[in-house]
A protein has these predicted regions:
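N-terminal export signals
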Residues: 4-6, 11-33
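C-terminal segment of N-terminal export signals and the immediately downstream linker at the start
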Residues: 5, 27-64, 256, 532
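Dinucleotide-binding Rossmann-like beta1-alpha1 core, especially the glycine-rich loop
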Residues: 89-166
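Rossmann-like flavin
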Residues: 132-225
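A glycine-rich dinucleotide-binding beta-alpha-beta segment and adjacent secondary-structure elements
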Residues: 208-218, 380, 438-502
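Helical element adjacent to the flavin cofactor pocket in flavoenzyme catalytic cores
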Residues: 236-275, 284
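Mid-domain catalytic core of redox enzymes
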Residues: 274-394
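C-terminal segments that line or cap access tunnels to active or ligand-binding sites in enzymes
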Residues: 344-457
Length: 532
């Protein structure tokens, strides 16, 4: 069995950058591939998992006439792109800000014919950052304004700030504008970490904190994240500003689910995949669910976790040893701790949407990554009613207090949690939540503790329960190794999600399209060269 090759690091970065530009995609190519498969109903596809990657894959295949069965163990589609109701409040599970309009998500959703069914709101600022040493608000869709504000607070690092953001803008010009320079900034940054790149220009750790503030979105420290990747991803935010799918992220998930069903695809909720079935020729023939019902398939796209796929759903000895080794070398990403608050009044005194609060005097050492006592970690505050009018019912406010979290502090509660013995676990999560509220009340929202009408707390174990992701991971595997190809060494098995392509709304949507396209290429090849 031939192993699907991994991309070398340099090729991986180049492929990632090409994929981030809609202009690099052959948008007509998908339809041409579909036309090459005349008897589409003879090529059924099963997708495991209705996260955004699975939804996009299923939407593409159903739109072009293929028989699609999407299996989802939960009651709703979307994975983390969903919401839940408590009293008068509807809380978004995951979305704070993304880039959709004028970027890859708009291109994908337009290609599927559903972009016009969605609306986005723009964040009023890029970010506000509050620390013991400074309080700064970075403006949205205004790279020069960001630089000017950093100049104001850190005049001693003026030249370094200018040079850092100039280099970021050059990357964007090379990537999106197709411009060429005597020295390629993409080539310069490709071998560097974010920490190394920043250190070429500035020394003040507070300035580095501001420059690297978005690294938490990718679940890695500046010493681990690739400089070029960060320049591209953060450059999108600088230029386009943070955006939000109205009225909640589940509107995006529902639009994709509606697209699937409108094109005669099936979504089976409360249906957990059990194992992938192979025929007597060792070809994939379907997926058996936990109720022992087999759903026929010529190809399977996995939007579930890779550990579950290869350890629980695949027969043993199906994977080449080298591929197994590549998987085993990967590290599960961080999870999250979130406090969802519904307030009984409007917050007229605070107008910011996203606020980072860190009260450690050496803020750069942690940069919103978890501390030994999670209660003292940096907090990301999102006040959703400052995003658009009518987010909450009149006179009330919806907000979240969130930090990244390792799984290790929660592991000791795991067995009791899944056996519904949660007293000790509940005390710990409430201790952390109360400390978060106390800190935010003192620094940002006076009187917060007296406004709370509804409070829900999500931990890594909560994430694990609802998504079945190992350790409650929110980004799949860490980005410290190159992404996996959609096509696996097992013929007919494809990957589409955070575990293969990296976490975040945009990467998993791109993964969904890539996986569906890879399936069609294999179908076309099998027609041209039938099995003997």
């Amino acid at each position: 069995m031939k192993q699907t090759p991994y991309l070398p690091r340099r090729n991986f970065i180049k492929t990632l950058l090409m994929a981030s530009s809609a202009a690099a995609i052959d948008w007509a190519g998908f339809g041409k591939l579909a036309e090459a498969v005349p008897n589409k109903k003879d090529f059924p596809v099963v997708i495991i998992g209705a996260g955004l990657g699975g939804l996009v894959s299923a939407a593409y295949l159903a739109r072009y006439g293929f028989s699609v069965t999407l299996m989802e163990q939960h009651a709703v589609a979307g994975g983390y792109a969903t919401s839940f109701d408590r009293g008068d409040f509807t809380f978004d599970v995951s979305l704070h800000a993304t880039v959709a309009e004028h970027a890859m998500p708009q291109a994908i959703l337009s290609d599927l014919g559903i972009w016009d069914n969605l609306k986005v709101a723009y964040a009023p600022e890029l970010r506000r950052i509050i620390t013991p040493g400074f309080d700064i608000t970075l403006p949205a869709k205004n790279p020069k304004g960001v630089i000017t504000e950093l100049f104001r607070v850190f005049p001693h690092e003026k030249q370094g700030i200018h040079d850092f953001y100039s280099e970021m803008e050059q990357v964007i010009s090379e990537l999106w504008g197709g411009k060429r320079f005597d020295i390629s900034m993409m080539a310069k940054l490709e071998p560097l970490t974010l920490e190394q790149w920043m250190s070429l220009h500035v020394k003040d750790p507070d300035v580095k904190y501001c420059m690297a503030v978005f690294s938490g979105y990718y679940g890695l420290s500046p010493a681990e994240i690739n400089a070029l990747f960060y320049a591209v991803a953060t450059g999108e935010y600088l230029v386009h500003g943070g955006q939000y799918y109205k009225t909640r992220s589940r509107d995006l998930s529902n639009a994709l689910a509606d697209c699937i069903e409108a094109n005669h695809g099936k979504i089976l909720y409360h249906t957990e995949a059990g194992r992938i079935v192979f025929d007597h020729n060792n070809q994939i023939s379907g997926v058996m669910d936990k109720n022992k019902i087999t759903h026929p398939a010529k190809a399977v796209i996995a939007n579930c976790s890779i550990p579950a796929l290869f350890n629980k759903m695949m027969p043993k000895n199906r994977l080449p040893p080298e591929f197994e080794k590549k998987i085993s070398q990967r590290r599960v990403s961080l999870s999250s701790f979130a406090v969802f608050l519904g307030l009984n009044k409007a917050l007229d005194q605070v107008h910011d949407y996203e606020i980072d609060l860190d009260q450690d005097k050496e803020v750069y050492k942690n940069l919103l990554l978890p501390k030994a006592d999670l209660a003292e970690s940096g907090i990301s505050i999102t006040i959703y009613d400052n995003l658009f009018k009518g987010y909450s019912v009149p006179g009330k406010t919806t907000l979240t207090l969130m930090c990244l979290s390792n799984f290790e502090p929660w592991k000791k509660y795991e067995a009791d949690y899944f056996n519904n013995r949660k007293d000790v676990y509940n005390r710990e999560k409430e201790r952390i939540a109360r400390r978060f509220i106390e800190r935010v009340e003192k620094a940002v929202i006076p009187g917060l503790s007296h406004m709370i009408e509804v409070m829900e707390i999500g931990t890594p174990l909560t994430n694990m329960f609802y998504t079945k992701n190992p350790q409650g991971a929110i980004y799949g595997f860490d980005r410290n190794l190159p992404q996996l190809n959609s096509k696996t060494p097992v013929k007919g098995l494809y990957l589409a999600g955070a575990w293969s392509h990296g976490g975040g709304y945009t990467p998993v949507m791109m993964a969904g399209r890539e996986a569906a396209e890879s399936v069609l290429k294999e179908f076309k090849h099998s027609i041209a060269q039938p099995e003997t």
